[in-house]
């Protein structure tokens, strides 16, 4: 058995019936020592830990409570939470089995208050609770209830400490772990730590905090729980407090404690960075952990943590890992924040926190917020940031180039500046190709384009027209047409395009031929410069704008990605050509742009002149963006450069910085989009066309090219998120891992009672008994299992008079506990067996109890020589055992005949309650009363039958049965209801004595 003395467990009522003989069940064996507690198990990720709460379950183990003490520290836990490690020990709490009791731990919730839990500190142990996480182990989970404690969990916050928590593992003791739940909380707060985590990895620690939380709590929990609980230990609560301590933890968590460090960052975890907490881990040993709880106080700081928010996610992530850092726990002090931890309660929830470990991250999680670290996390976003970089590609966005028309928007481009980066875009040069054009559209961003500005070149914008076209380029499609590039020429103007709008003029695209300029188109990106578009005047040509449709091609913009090209912007100088952009007006032809394919013209042909087309600016849809990129060739439009004057516009170029976006610059390639020139038609935007002059910029447009990307640049903003990147750290969280051993499962609960035994099958009719051989000594009864709850007993049947004993019928034995020794006495003839009463309902099976010791056997009456056993009749199904009727007087026992074959075992009926035992047969034949039966545990699963005792030596043989055949079975007395194990009905009349039965097997 679990080694537990279950006596404390309520025993189900034993109907027991006479059973009597049964012999007292021996005392249960001593309970085995509780198994070792399981390994605390690594702290769960803390973060989650909050979840941990669940760990609480483990609380059960708690009983060992141990926990209690365990809990104690909690406070420290603060960081030490780590120490939580020791928590492991908490594990033992496992035993706590009781821990279950820990359930009460729920009160742990109270733990909330637990904050005070600080005390909980001890809860700390709980930290170990963290481990409580382990609480997982908690399977006992129930204790988990305790998790409630977990509420205390809030304390959990301390959890951050929890980080330390990890150590919390120890928390494992988690049962405490129960507390663990608290830990949950912990995690949350811990989360902050998570912040830490951020760096946290530490943060992650937080996670540990998780556990911390847990732990924290855990401590509590578990501890308490079971801790104590003793089982009951209950302790409850765990002392919940301990957990509470957790609370303290909360504090810790409190934020962060993590943040604790960060303190404010708290959450932010940012600090999380503090991840340093990393160190956290170390503390783990702290095991003290619990202590930490107090730190938790610090937790106050935690509040600061909020800011941590920022980390929010970030932290979390990280931290989680950190959890281990839990050590950081110290920061845990911050835990003081613990209060915040309170929130931890929720941590309870954390139960799951188990994972809570994760919680570490959870920590943040706790913060859920990402809380704290998470905040940081955002930064992680930033990581994204980089992403934005990609956006650059968005350069493709260049597509927007079409927008380019909006080119004007370009101004916005300024932001593009940021794009500066875009320059890099320059590299985008290549972007120049078409994408640019798109960009052109981008242009607006074009402003960025201006970026192109960088391009100043923006002016190239004219080509920008191109750009327009570029946009068109977008049209790029055209671009595809790229060829359209021809118009692309316009494209050049395209840049202006941005003003492009004029891209429509891309129509001019017709001019497209200028397309060559289109080449310039690339500049188009600068198109954004297009803003320059002012010159839009040229826009008139914008008329061509219609062609803008072509702009669709802008599609091309895609190419924009190349934005990298953005660099290109330099080229923007070319913008001069932008003038050509005017041509853009020409753009009208832009429609022609479709021909874009002519893109080949790509020369870019000086056609820049086409710039005028810019006016067409209308922008074709350009949106397409498209392909145009290819049109890139249009770039030639350069000639359009004349427009360059507008180049001045180029100033806009300044925007160029936007260029950063320029990266998108690559979009610049959109310039190719120039072909989009058709967009030229967009030229109208062309007015912007004037921009055409900017077209000049166009050349610069080239740079502009970049510009377009610039817009992408806009995208840049996302960059910020990049910060989130930090989050990445989070990774550590892992630490949590330790969840610690699962803590031992607590010792097994007391064994359940043995379930009731099914009624025994009715015995087959016994053949006439042969002369009884000497009765072998009964084997020692096996230890009875604890009785399971027993079903209601059936009423006892009235015992029939005992008929003469027939041979004993051999029914399949019900599983029965060992029988008590049979008292001596001759068996009277068996009365009829009483009818079996209806079977009692089976009680729920109790835990299998340990087998009780067999009762002492009563003295064995001398058995008559066994007659041959009659054949055993088939076993009837077990009927419900009726209550046994009174036993009739037993007739003299005939010699036992040889034992007949056993009948088939009847189905076991439900075990009825044992009926009262009928009176025994008269002495002489009467069988001695059985010794008192030990309580029959309800039969759980039947215990194994003890080996039969050796059969005593055979008594003198009675006269041989006639032939040893089974005598007729005596009438079977009514079967008494089978009590737990009803006594065996009297034997039927003896058959002719058979030869002595063989000695019983031992």
Swiss-Prot record:
<feature type="compositionally biased region" description="Low complexity">
    <location>
        <begin position="697"/>
        <end position="706"/>
    </location>
</feature>
<feature type="compositionally biased region" description="Low complexity">
    <location>
        <begin position="505"/>
        <end position="522"/>
    </location>
</feature>
<comment type="subunit">
    <text>Trimers of one alpha 2(I) and two alpha 1(I) chains. Interacts (via C-terminus) with TMEM131 (via PapD-L domain); the interaction is direct and is involved in assembly and TRAPPIII ER-to-Golgi transport complex-dependent secretion of collagen.</text>
</comment>
<feature type="compositionally biased region" description="Gly residues">
    <location>
        <begin position="806"/>
        <end position="828"/>
    </location>
</feature>
<feature type="compositionally biased region" description="Low complexity">
    <location>
        <begin position="145"/>
        <end position="166"/>
    </location>
</feature>
<feature type="compositionally biased region" description="Gly residues">
    <location>
        <begin position="545"/>
        <end position="554"/>
    </location>
</feature>
<keyword id="KW-0272">Extracellular matrix</keyword>
<feature type="modified residue" description="4-hydroxyproline">
    <location>
        <position position="28"/>
    </location>
</feature>
<comment type="function">
    <text>Type I collagen is a member of group I collagen (fibrillar forming collagen).</text>
</comment>
<feature type="modified residue" description="5-hydroxylysine; alternate">
    <location>
        <position position="89"/>
    </location>
</feature>
<feature type="region of interest" description="Disordered">
    <location>
        <begin position="1"/>
        <end position="1002"/>
    </location>
</feature>
<keyword id="KW-0964">Secreted</keyword>
<dbReference type="InterPro" id="IPR050938">
    <property type="entry name" value="Collagen_Structural_Proteins"/>
</dbReference>
<feature type="compositionally biased region" description="Basic and acidic residues">
    <location>
        <begin position="908"/>
        <end position="919"/>
    </location>
</feature>
<feature type="modified residue" description="4-hydroxyproline">
    <location>
        <position position="34"/>
    </location>
</feature>
<feature type="compositionally biased region" description="Low complexity">
    <location>
        <begin position="795"/>
        <end position="805"/>
    </location>
</feature>
<feature type="compositionally biased region" description="Gly residues">
    <location>
        <begin position="308"/>
        <end position="317"/>
    </location>
</feature>
<feature type="compositionally biased region" description="Low complexity">
    <location>
        <begin position="628"/>
        <end position="648"/>
    </location>
</feature>
<keyword id="KW-0379">Hydroxylation</keyword>
<feature type="compositionally biased region" description="Low complexity">
    <location>
        <begin position="534"/>
        <end position="544"/>
    </location>
</feature>
<feature type="compositionally biased region" description="Low complexity">
    <location>
        <begin position="211"/>
        <end position="232"/>
    </location>
</feature>
<dbReference type="InterPro" id="IPR008160">
    <property type="entry name" value="Collagen"/>
</dbReference>
<feature type="compositionally biased region" description="Low complexity">
    <location>
        <begin position="760"/>
        <end position="787"/>
    </location>
</feature>
<feature type="modified residue" description="4-hydroxyproline">
    <location>
        <position position="355"/>
    </location>
</feature>
<feature type="compositionally biased region" description="Basic and acidic residues">
    <location>
        <begin position="833"/>
        <end position="851"/>
    </location>
</feature>
<feature type="compositionally biased region" description="Low complexity">
    <location>
        <begin position="853"/>
        <end position="898"/>
    </location>
</feature>
<feature type="modified residue" description="4-hydroxyproline">
    <location>
        <position position="10"/>
    </location>
</feature>
<feature type="glycosylation site" description="O-linked (Gal...) hydroxylysine; alternate">
    <location>
        <position position="89"/>
    </location>
</feature>
<feature type="compositionally biased region" description="Gly residues">
    <location>
        <begin position="266"/>
        <end position="275"/>
    </location>
</feature>
<feature type="compositionally biased region" description="Gly residues">
    <location>
        <begin position="449"/>
        <end position="458"/>
    </location>
</feature>
<keyword id="KW-0325">Glycoprotein</keyword>
<feature type="compositionally biased region" description="Low complexity">
    <location>
        <begin position="381"/>
        <end position="400"/>
    </location>
</feature>
<dbReference type="GO" id="GO:0005576">
    <property type="term" value="C:extracellular region"/>
</dbReference>
<keyword id="KW-0873">Pyrrolidone carboxylic acid</keyword>
<feature type="compositionally biased region" description="Gly residues">
    <location>
        <begin position="743"/>
        <end position="752"/>
    </location>
</feature>
<feature type="compositionally biased region" description="Low complexity">
    <location>
        <begin position="330"/>
        <end position="346"/>
    </location>
</feature>
<feature type="compositionally biased region" description="Low complexity">
    <location>
        <begin position="577"/>
        <end position="621"/>
    </location>
</feature>
<feature type="compositionally biased region" description="Low complexity">
    <location>
        <begin position="666"/>
        <end position="676"/>
    </location>
</feature>
<feature type="compositionally biased region" description="Low complexity">
    <location>
        <begin position="17"/>
        <end position="60"/>
    </location>
</feature>
<dbReference type="Pfam" id="PF01391">
    <property type="entry name" value="Collagen"/>
</dbReference>
<feature type="modified residue" description="4-hydroxyproline">
    <location>
        <position position="352"/>
    </location>
</feature>
<feature type="compositionally biased region" description="Low complexity">
    <location>
        <begin position="276"/>
        <end position="286"/>
    </location>
</feature>
């Amino acid at each position: 058995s679990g080694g537990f003395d279950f006596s404390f467990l309520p025993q189900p009522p034993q109907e027991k019936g006479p059973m009597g003989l049964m012999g007292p069940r021996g005392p249960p064996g001593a309970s085995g020592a509780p198994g070792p507690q399981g390994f605390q198990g690594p702290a769960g990720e803390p973060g989650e830990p909050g979840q941990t709460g669940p760990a609480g379950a483990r609380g059960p183990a708690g009983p060992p409570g141990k926990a209690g003490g365990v809990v104690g520290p909690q406070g420290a836990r603060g960081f030490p939470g780590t120490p939580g490690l020791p928590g492991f020990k908490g594990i033992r709490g496992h035993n706590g089995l009781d821990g279950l009791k820990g359930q009460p731990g729920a009160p742990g919730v109270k733990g909330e208050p637990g904050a005070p839990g600080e005390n909980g500190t001890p809860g700390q142990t709980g930290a170990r609770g963290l481990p409580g996480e382990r609480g997982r182990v908690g399977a006992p989970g129930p204790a988990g209830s305790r998790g409630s404690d977990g509420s205390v969990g809030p304390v959990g916050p301390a959890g951050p400490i929890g980080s330390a928590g990890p150590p919390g593992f120890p928390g494992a003791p988690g049962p405490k772990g129960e507390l663990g739940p608290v830990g949950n909380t912990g995690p949350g707060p811990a989360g902050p730590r998570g912040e830490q985590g951020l760096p946290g990895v530490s943060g992650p620690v937080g996670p540990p905090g998780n556990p911390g939380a847990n732990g924290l709590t855990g401590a509590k929990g578990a501890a308490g729980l079971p801790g104590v609980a003793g089982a009951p230990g209950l302790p409850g609560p765990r002392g919940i407090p301990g957990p509470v301590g957790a609370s303290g933890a909360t504090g810790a968590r409190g934020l962060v404690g993590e943040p604790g460090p960060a303190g404010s960052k708290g959450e932010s975890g940012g600090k999380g960075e503090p991840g340093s907490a990393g160190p956290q881990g170390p503390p783990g040993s702290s095991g003290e952990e619990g202590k930490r709880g107090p730190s938790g106080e610090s937790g106050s700081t935690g509040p600061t943590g909020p800011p941590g928010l920022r980390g929010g996610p970030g932290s979390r992530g990280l931290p989680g890992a950190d959890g281990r850092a839990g050590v950081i726990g110290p920061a845990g002090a911050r835990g003081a924040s613990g209060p915040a931890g309170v929130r931890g309660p929720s941590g309870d929830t954390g139960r799951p926190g188990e994972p809570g470990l994760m919680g570490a991250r959870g920590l943040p999680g706790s913060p859920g917020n990402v809380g704290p670290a998470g905040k940081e996390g955002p930064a992680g976003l930033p990581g994204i940031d980089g992403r934005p970089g990609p956006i650059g590609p968005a350069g493709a966005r260049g597509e927007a180039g079409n927008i380019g028309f909006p080119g004007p928007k370009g101004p916005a481009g300024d932001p593009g500046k940021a794009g500066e980066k875009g320059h890099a875009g320059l590299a985008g040069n290549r972007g120049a190709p078409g994408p640019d054009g798109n960009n052109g559209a981008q242009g607006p961003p074009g402003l960025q384009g201006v970026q192109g500005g960088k391009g100043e070149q923006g002016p190239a914008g004219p080509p920008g027209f191109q750009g327009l076209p570029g946009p068109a380029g977008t049209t790029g499609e055209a671009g595809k047409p790229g060829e359209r590039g021809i118009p692309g020429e316009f494209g050049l103007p395209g840049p202006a395009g941005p003003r492009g709008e004029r891209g429509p003029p891309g129509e001019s695209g017709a001019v497209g031929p200028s397309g060559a300029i289109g080449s310039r188109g690339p500049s188009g990106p600068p198109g954004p410069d297009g803003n320059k578009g002012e010159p839009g005047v040229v826009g008139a040509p914008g008329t061509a704008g219609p062609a803008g449709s072509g702009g669709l091609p802008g599609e091309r913009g895609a190419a924009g990605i190349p934005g990298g090209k953005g660099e290109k912007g330099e080229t923007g100088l070319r913008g001069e050509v932008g003038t050509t952009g005017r041509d853009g007006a020409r753009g009208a032809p832009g429609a022609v742009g479709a021909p874009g394919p002519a893109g080949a013209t790509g020369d870019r042909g000086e056609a820049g002149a086409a710039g005028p087309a810019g006016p067409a600016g209308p922008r074709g849809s350009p949106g397409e963006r498209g392909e145009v990129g290819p049109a890139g060739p249009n770039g030639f439009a350069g000639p359009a450069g004349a427009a360059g004057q507008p180049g001045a516009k180029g100033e806009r170029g300044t925007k160029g910085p936007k260029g950063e976006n320029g990266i998108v610059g690559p979009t610049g390639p959109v310039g190719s989009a120039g072909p989009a020139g058709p967009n030229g038609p967009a030229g109208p935007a062309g007015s912007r066309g004037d921009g055409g002059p900017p077209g000049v910029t166009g050349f610069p447009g080239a740079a502009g090219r970049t510009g377009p990307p610039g817009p992408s640049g806009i995208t840049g903003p996302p960059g910020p998120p990049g910060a989130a990147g930090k989050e990445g750290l989070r990774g550590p969280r892992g630490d949590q891992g330790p969840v610690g051993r699962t803590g031992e499962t607590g010792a097994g609960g007391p064994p359940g009672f043995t379930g009731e035994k099914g009624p025994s099958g009715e015995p087959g009719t016994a053949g006439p008994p042969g002369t009884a051989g000497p009765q072998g000594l009964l084997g020692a009864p096996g230890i009875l299992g604890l009785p399971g709850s027993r079903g209601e007993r059936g009423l006892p049947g009235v015992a029939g008079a005992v008929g003469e004993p027939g041979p004993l019928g051999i029914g399949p034995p019900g599983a029965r506990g060992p029988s008590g020794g049979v008292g001596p006495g001759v068996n009277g003839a068996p009365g009829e067996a009483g009818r079996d009463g209806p079977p009692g309902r089976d009680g729920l099976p109790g835990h299998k109890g340990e087998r009780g010791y067999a009762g002492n056997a009563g003295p064995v009456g001398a058995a008559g020589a066994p007659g041959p056993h009659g054949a055993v009749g088939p076993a009837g199904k077990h009927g419900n055992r009726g209550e046994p009727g009174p036993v009739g007087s037993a007739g003299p026992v005939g010699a036992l005949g040889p034992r007949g074959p056993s009948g088939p075992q009847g189905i076991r009926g439900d075990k009825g309650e044992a009926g009262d035992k009928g009176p025994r047969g008269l002495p002489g034949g009467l069988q001695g009363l059985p010794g008192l039966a030990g309580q029959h545990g309800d039969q759980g699963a039947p215990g194994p039958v003890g080996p039969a005792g050796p059969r005593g030596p055979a008594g003198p043989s009675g006269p041989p049965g006639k032939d040893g055949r089974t005598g007729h079975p005596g009438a079977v007395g009514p079967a008494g209801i089978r009590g737990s194990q009803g006594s065996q009905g009297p034997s039927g009349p003896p058959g002719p004595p058979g030869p002595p039965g063989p000695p019983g097997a031992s």
